[in-house]
UniProtKB/Swiss-Prot annotation:
Keywords: ATP-binding, Cytoplasm, Ligase, Nucleotide-binding, Pantothenate biosynthesis. This is Pantothenate synthetase. GO terms for molecular function: ATP binding; pantoate-beta-alanine ligase activity. GO terms for cellular component: cytosol. Catalyzes the condensation of pantoate with beta-alanine in an ATP-dependent reaction via a pantoyl-adenylate intermediate. It catalyses: (R)-pantoate + beta-alanine + ATP = (R)-pantothenate + AMP + diphosphate + H(+). NCBIfam families: panC. Pfam families: Pantoate_ligase. Pathway: Cofactor biosynthesis; (R)-pantothenate biosynthesis; (R)-pantothenate from (R)-pantoate and beta-alanine: step 1/1. It comes from Rhizobium meliloti (strain 1021) (Ensifer meliloti). The keyword Cytoplasm applies. It is found in: Cytoplasm. ATP binds at residues 30-37, 147-150, 176, 184-187. Belongs to the pantothenate synthetase family.
Amino acid sequence: MRTISTIADLREALAEHRRAGRSIGLVPTMGYLHVGHMELVRRAGSENDVVVASIFVNPLQFGANEDLGKYPRDLARDQALLTDGGVDFLFAPGVSDMYPRPMETVVDVPKLGSELEGAVRPGHFAGVATVVTKLFNIVQPDRAYFGEKDFQQLQIIRRMVEDLAQPVTVIGVPTVREEDGLACSSRNVYLTTQERRAAAIVPKALDEAERLIASGVTEPAEVEKRVLEFLAGEPLARPEVVALRDPETLGPVSEIEEKPVLLLLFVRFGTTKLLDNRVIAPKSARFAKVA
């Protein structure tokens, strides 16, 4: 694996592969990799001739009081993991490489990006869309891989690609989980031992929603209310978003019928924010009662 830090060097390195007609897969990350990231790498390697992973802690997507300064970083560790994973190129630019002067151009998907997580993190998704667009312009991948754990982000990127006719296929990869069901996340390392134990309630809350829907609850507000009550059983959990939405548009759902619905959770434990979600198909819910 070759590590590259400048845009010009990466473009030059990829040009010969592009001329040879080789397909390129991109796995954008902020580093401090875990098994979820490595599943993205594995998928990219199975579907492309050349795999590029990027590591860049993007300041545009962090708010003034967020964790930019303490976001975990360990480039040597990440390089070893990516080498073992078969990545061909690691693009690891500095802030001055990506943003040599203050950005005047911002890519925003305002409707999708201002709700749910965007409502409690204003400007976050504009920062994401901007850096992802820049990475797409630099790498020019055939395919780009994102985890379904960040479902709102995934749908925003898909809409951005569609609206701007960007020549890349966006592929969502199912969430990888730890033994107790907690979604793998670089931010899990922030949790204290007590908070980590408490965080197991997040995937259990998704199970609870699926049970409710399988039992015949059709009012989204009722499901949301009861999931909030369920989360209230864990004193360390502070839910910020509990929302049932349409999985394609992220718009509100008036009633739970035959169409799948998406439950999005955004829960704080101490200073750590955890995201999770599940798409639930009412007729095939795992907890459906046997007739």
